[in-house]
Amino acid sequence: YLFNGESLKLITRDHSFVEELVRSGVITREQAETHPQRNILMRAVGTSPFIKADTGIVEWKDGDIIMLCSDGLHGSMNIRLAEEILSSESNLLTACDRLTDAALAAGSSDNVTVVLVKNAGGIGA
């Protein structure tokens, strides 16, 4: 996800079985949220010595935050709550803790992983 100080924007897509079903029109995004096979991965890092990585270009401005997270986070909590946490917390470590706590409080039954990286400007920004 990319957080621009106001809202989170999904900048990747899941490599899951249900995402393939959604993309092919077999099921809706709403049906995918409760599909019994929603956690089946079609591609993942560490499953093979060779992986196919998706690449792209995203405008990343000074102050923007990239949020990498597992489905234990994004699959269990409201996106608006994540935006509220990122808007109100300037310390990234504390924001990670708060996001993790919120996902667990929302009932996540999966592992919860979150990494935040902030563009602090400077060379290469």
What are these regions (language model features)?
Residues Y1-L2, T12:
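A short macromolecule-binding patch
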Residues L2-F3, N78:
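Cytochrome P450 core scaffold surrounding the K-helix E-X-X-R motif
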Residues F3-S7, N119-A120:
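Short acidic-glycine loop/turn motifs at beta-strand connectors
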Residues E6, R13-D14, A82:
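Residue-level structural signal for beta-strand termini and adjacent loop
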Residues R13-D62:
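Conserved, helical-rich catalytic subdomain that frames metal- and/or nucleotide-binding sites
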Residues I40-P49, G56-I85, T100, L104-A106, ...:
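Conserved beta-strand-loop-short alpha-helix elements that form
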Residues S87-A95:
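Short, charged, surface-exposed loops that flank catalytic or proteolytic processing sites
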Residues G122-A125:
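Intrinsically disordered or compositionally simple regulatory linkers and C-terminal tails
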